[in-house]
Amino acid sequence: MKDVITPPQHLYPYRWFLEDTVFTKDKGKVFSCFACGGGSTMGYKIAGYDVIGCNEIDPRMMKCYETNHHPQYSYLEDIRDLVKRNNLPEELYHLDILDGSPPCSTFSMSGLREDAWGKEKKFKEGQKTQVLDTLFFDFIALAKRLKPKVVIAENVKGLLLGNAIDYVRRIYKDFEEAGYYCQHFLLDASKMGVPQKRERVFFICIRHDLGVHFLKVSDLFNVEPYIDMEFNESEIYYGEYADYKGKPIGVKMRKLFEQRVAGDIALAEAYKKPVSYTHLTLPTMLAV
């Protein structure tokens, strides 16, 4: 007899509906860079923040963002051009959080990594040619200009691995010169109420004049106390959102799985097994 999976009670339930959500907008003001369709913006809104604007270079993504979030300020342009603007509204100089997810493909373990560093990338979608691996520093330059209370930046785990660690050292150095104490954390979405394993690194930076009152700084890379980032959420297993009785997934998804190529998934053991992982949290590529 197959086990029946009883879904755990999650502190941050993933089964929520937009019409049931109250956006209080009372926690502070946020501006989002590299905003794409607004994934991080939705998170801030659910948490009670007022996301007043965004920056995005892709016209299609900006259209999606504006349709979903109706920003007060939107800048469809290269972040390097945004940094140079001399007509930014005064409200952007009084932000609580500057948020950004600089392009990560050049640091991803599934990307070109070192072979792509320092090289301009041309996009088939038509947006401006850019050197992707330096955009993080342009984001910090914007932080230096706007002086928000807190800066939060997200990127892939690969930024912490191999030769990419030199970028992390410069990120810390540039944040210090911009006037911020910096800490970084490698977080796993499966420990935070998300039904997939997705590891991302987050840089959380506090402005010097605020952090000096409660932070102990021994050197550039050692700022204490560390922010408590332990969410301790129960993992959401495949069987919880696919089939509580542990039945295999449908033919379409199983065929997709069988036609996968090397690198599609992190679990090597899955190559010769069926897809009915009722007691496992699926890796990113299969969590659909």
List PLM regions with ranges.
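Core alpha/beta nucleotide-donor-binding catalytic domains of modification enzymes
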Residues: 7-147, 157-161, 166
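Class I S-adenosyl-L-methionine
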Residues: 85-95, 109-282
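Extended charged
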Residues: 1-4
